[in-house]
Every structure is written in C-alpha cells, then in structure tokens.
Amino acid sequence: MPIFYESLSDNLRDWALRQPLFFVSSAPYRGRHINVSPKGLPDSSFAVLSPSKVAYVDSTGSGCETICHLRENGRATVMFCSFDATPRIMRLFCTGSVIEWNDPRYAGYVKRMGVKSLVGARAVIILDIFKVQISCGFGVPLLDLTVDPETNEPKPCFTNRPRLGKFAEYTINRGELPEYQMQWNSRSLDGLPGLHSAMRDKGEFIWWAHVTNWASYYHFQLDIIKTGMALMFLVMVVAQWVGYVLYQW
C-alpha cells in the first residue's frame, strides 16, 4: 500500500542518492506524446536542495521533451526504484522550471547543488515537490548475477521477486482482493475513475465515470467555449455602452 508525504525526509533523500538511476516523466497539455527519460549519475547530477526542492543537471540529448513540457505547464514526476534486496519505489510529484546553461543563475545553482557541471550540460531543472509517494516495489526485478554459459563468466541479470505473487495469492485466498481493489484501484490520485469492477463494488455508477472522463478530456475545449461566451458578452455590453454614449451626444 502506498504511503504519502508532503516532503522528503533525510532517510528518503539518502536512499534516493544511492540509486544508480532515476526517471523523469512529463507531458504536454494537449499533445499525444508522454515522455519518460532515464537519468544516470544521480550522485553527481541530482541534488536535494531542501525537503521540498530538488534539482538535476540536464545533459544535451536527442530530444528536449522535459524542458518543453515544463515550460508549457510546469508538471513533472521523478521516480526512483531499487534493484537490490530491499524493494522500494519513490515518486516525487513536482512542479518545475528550467535554468539554461547561459542563464546568469546557472552557475549559482550548480554550485548550490554541489555537483560539477557535466560536459555538454544544457540546463538545470528545478523541481518543487508537492507530494512524495512510497510504494513497495515488489514488481521491480532484482539485479543479480548469473554465469554466461558460453564464456563461463559471471554476468548481471534480472530476476523476478516472488513477493508480489505471494501477496496476491494470500489476498485472494483470504477473499480480500475486491476490498483491496476498492480501496486502491477505483480512483486515480486526481480522482479520475479507475477499475470499473472496483467502482461497481463501491456502489458507483459506471455511466457517471464515462461522463467524468468525457468532461475531463474535453475540459480544455469547454474552457475555450466559456471564455468565448464571456468575451462575447463583454463585447455586447461595451457595444451597448458605446451606442448609449453616442446616442446621448
């Protein structure tokens, strides 16, 4: 079951900096492409500036999705996960901004982060945390060693953790799976409708879920229509006022 915090504690900060990589996801408001970028070198490019603010040095790459999305809507999520014996997933839900390499503030942020500016770095990404989510990570594979049959040399490999399957089996045997799904799978973090079977078990109407999804999907167009109607009303009021003034003359 997930646990939520408003900021990073010292032990979560230290754990994050020990991980070999992290992931950054972002998306435009209306575009089709949702971006996920793996980032290496967290110990030398990622920094925790305060319990509610983190930053990382962004290297030049073949795309610029995160920077573009942050400048459009300021939304990003950072995820760390453990590949060792102790499983964990940590997500940092953030709002962010971009400090480019030629910005006068860039050198100051790099110094504050306590990292060396990477060769080819193009920006520092500043992220303000508004929610921290911790979950079990039992579905993340374990990094292990095996023997290459051709060379007889050890090589890294991924092995599945048995805990997730055992948890599901235990929950099913106790008849607790529907209750678990009702609690954790019926809604998203933002309240969007989720698993229909879980919603039915909670006594919710699926047709209303479809209406909610439709309204969420088309809210941008609805906002444009409402704004257009408000502007039209304002123009009509101004036109009537101008006509009244001219009539008085």
From Swiss-Prot:
Source taxon at top rank: Eukaryota
Binding site for FMN: 76-81, 91-92, 105, 163-164
Pathway: Mycotoxin biosynthesis
Class of enzymatic activity (EC top level): oxidoreductase
GO molecular function terms listed in the Swiss-Prot or TrEMBL record: oxidoreductase activity
Cofactor(s) for this UniProt protein: FMN
Keyword Cell wall biogenesis/degradation: no
UniProt key word Thylakoid: no
Similarity comment: Belongs to the pyridoxamine 5'-phosphate oxidase family.
Protein name per UniProt: Pyridoxamine 5'-phosphate oxidase family protein ustO
Organism: Aspergillus flavus (strain ATCC 200026 / FGSC A1120 / IAM 13836 / NRRL 3357 / JCM 12722 / SRRC 167)
Upper taxonomic lineage: Eukaryota, Fungi, Dikarya, Ascomycota, Pezizomycotina
